[in-house]
Amino acid sequence: MPIVRAKPTSPGRRFVEKVVHPHLYKGRPFAALLESKSKTGGRNNNGRITTRHIGGGHKQHYRIIDFKRTKDNIPATVERIEYDPNRTAHIALLKYADGERRYIIAAKKQAVGDTVMSGELSPIRPGNCLPLKNIPLGTVIHNIELKIGKGAQMARAAGASVQLLGRDGIYAILRLRSGETRRVHVNCRAVIGEVSNTENNLKSLGKAGASRWRGIRPSVRGVAMNPVDHPHGGGEGRNKGRHPTSPWGQKSKGLKTRNNKRTDSMIIRRRAKKK
């Protein structure tokens, strides 16, 4: 898709770079697959901030996405490709042969009129969903289940993909974009192809207000705070005086915080370190 740079008619327009998607549907979303969505402001049920930098933003409806893809051996036609404010990927509205409609994450190069199927006998085409045991080695996939029947959990963001490297007994071996290699059960399902909207990382919001529309509040540096607010706060000038930490004293910039021994055995090779 073309990338458009706005004319600098104002300071807020000067740095805007947009990815134009002329193929996206311009009408309202399918009402039967919408749910109301309330803002939390990053607070829990006690009213305390549990996630910083969240608040405000435009009102949104949640689109109910079919991550399980369990409607097997019934062909569906892509009615339209839509924008979804809840995720970076685009979504596709499917109309099945029996008349039912469902939203799915749109695959790259998926277009209106394409036929989509789920199940073990589905052809190897972008957007089709199969168990990992039925997918040829070397295939690029997305929307991958980690538990059988739970629904897709991995590789769901715009442009995301995973490569199926091989099979070892009851496990398939996958290589993630991060460089990590891990095992997933061969009966878990995955969708063929990459996720749509691959140029999402090339856009530039251009101004702070565009982040506020998305419900993202400003991030304040720790060294700009007082000692009561952050371990980096206070002092003369801008000295931290210690290893970089979070506001709660947890070391950042390289400290490993993963604590999930239950699935450690599923990871064959950890992701590569940043240089």
UniProtKB/Swiss-Prot annotation:
Residues 222-275 are annotated as: Disordered. Keywords: Ribonucleoprotein, Ribosomal protein, RNA-binding, rRNA-binding. Residues 229-239 have a biased composition (Basic and acidic residues). The keyword RNA-binding applies. GO terms for molecular function: rRNA binding; structural constituent of ribosome; transferase activity. Gene3D superfamilies: 2.30.30.30, Nucleic acid-binding proteins, Ribosomal protein L2, domain 3. One of its GO terms (biological process) is cytoplasmic translation. GO terms for cellular component: large ribosomal subunit. PROSITE patterns: RIBOSOMAL_L2 (PS00467). Signal peptide: none annotated. Belongs to the universal ribosomal protein uL2 family. One of the primary rRNA binding proteins. Required for association of the 30S and 50S subunits to form the 70S ribosome, for tRNA binding and peptide bond formation. It has been suggested to have peptidyltransferase activity; this is somewhat controversial. Makes several contacts with the 16S rRNA in the 70S ribosome. PANTHER family: LARGE RIBOSOMAL SUBUNIT PROTEIN UL2M (PTHR13691:SF5), RIBOSOMAL PROTEIN L2 (PTHR13691). Part of the 50S ribosomal subunit. Forms a bridge to the 30S subunit in the 70S ribosome. This is Large ribosomal subunit protein uL2. The gene is rplB.
